[in-house]
Amino acid sequence: MNIKTIEGNLSAKDSKFAIVTSRFNDFIGGRLVEGALDCIVRHDGSEENIAIYKCPGAFEVPMVAKKLAQSGKWDAVIAIGVLIRGATAHFDYIAAEATKGIAQASLECGVPISFGVLTTDTIEQAIERAGTKAGNKGWDAASAAIEMVNLYKQM
């Protein structure tokens, strides 16, 4: 069989990335942003080609991500936020809407929007995913964005 397989590579050279992050739970979200920045720079990205947009909470992240994707200025958008389950159903509603909103924005805009929104049951789980035991999900979201930019370039 002679089937061609096309994949994106992990070179951020000359690509432009917007990071949208929520200020709510920023003591963890800031670590995710640091992970995303580190990933882009380590993969030959330039700090001049990165901008960080801060919004109030995870519910607003999809709106900002969509606006950034529609602007035509960015090769990819990295969506970052931190949701930690509390005593009410509020977590479930915000987590579901943020997830759906980010996916919908990416599909509608044709620009990769990677998902770096933590949805955890405890603060300890969030901390683990922000650079301790379970890696840094901001890094993972940036890595996915880089790969998708390069895959899109081959389409």
Swiss-Prot record:
(2S)-2-hydroxy-3-oxobutyl phosphate binds at residues 87-88, 129. One of its GO terms (biological process) is riboflavin biosynthetic process. GO terms for molecular function: 6,7-dimethyl-8-ribityllumazine synthase activity. GO terms for cellular component: cytosol; riboflavin synthase complex. Its EC number is 2.5.1.78. It catalyses: (2S)-2-hydroxy-3-oxobutyl phosphate + 5-amino-6-(D-ribitylamino)uracil = 6,7-dimethyl-8-(1-D-ribityl)lumazine + phosphate + 2 H2O + H(+). The keyword Transferase applies. It holds the Pfam family DMRL_synthase. InterPro entries: LS (IPR034964), LS/RS (IPR002180), LS/RS_sf (IPR036467). The active site is at 90 (proton donor). 5-amino-6-(D-ribitylamino)uracil binds at residues 24, 58-60, 82-84, 115. Pathway: Cofactor biosynthesis; riboflavin biosynthesis; riboflavin from 2-hydroxy-3-oxobutyl phosphate and 5-amino-6-(D-ribitylamino)uracil: step 1/2. It comes from the Bacteria. Belongs to the DMRL synthase family. PANTHER family: 6,7-DIMETHYL-8-RIBITYLLUMAZINE SYNTHASE, 6,7-DIMETHYL-8-RIBITYLLUMAZINE SYNTHASE DMRL SYNTHASE LUMAZINE SYNTHASE. This is 6,7-dimethyl-8-ribityllumazine synthase.
